[in-house]
Regions:
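Acidic, metal-coordinating helix/loop segments flanking the phosphotransfer/catalytic sites
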Residues: 37-55
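Conserved acidic segment of CheY-like receiver
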Residues: 7-18, 23-27, 56
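C-terminal output helix
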Residues: 113-122
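Short amphipathic alpha-helix used as the core "switch/output" element in two-component signaling
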Residues: 68-81
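Alpha4 helix (beta4-alpha4-beta5 surface) of REC/receiver domains from two-component response regulators
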Residues: 69, 91-107
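Acidic catalytic/metal-coordinating carboxylates
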Residues: 40, 66-69
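The feature encodes the CheY-like receiver
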Residues: 62-63, 93
Length: 126
């Protein structure tokens, strides 16, 4: 029997490879082997529109557009509006968490986070 998430494809979008690669590896370990990567918001949008994905995990520090603007574009899009969107922040008191939640964020993590934090968030979303 395959893991419950083995068919779900998640896009990890972060301008820093040092952030993306460990997260992709962790997703594979948790049963999401189909993760893909983007280094900016426009690349993320292109990938999301060209290949089916069930989720996006991104940094609010994306560029062109930033993470919050990307989230808003996704929620306004008829083809992407139901995509599960998660973000990770550096500070629990970050005002961006409130803005992103109001814009339709499905879940978030605060750095540094542990494997079980990511697993709990993904389980709650799916």
């Amino acid at each position: 029997m395959s893991p419950p998430y083995s068919s779900k494809k998640i896009l990890v979008a972060d301008p820093l490879m040092i952030q993306r690669k460990p997260l992709v590896h962790l997703l594979a370990k948790l049963g999401f082997p189909l993760a893909s990567e983007a280094e900016n918001g426009s690349q993320a949008l292109i990938l999301l529109k060209s290949e089916p994905h069930e989720g996006l995990i991104c940094s609010p520090h994306l560029e062109n557009p930033d993470g919050l603007s990307l989230l808003k574009r996704i929620r306004e899009s008829p083809e992407l509006g139901k995509l599960k969107v998660m973000m990770y922040f550096e500070d629990e008191d970050d005002d961006k968490i409130v803005s992103a939640t109001r814009a339709g964020l499905d879940g978030y993590l605060v750095f540094p986070f542990q494997e079980n934090n990511l697993e709990t968030m993904l389980t709650n979303i799916w």
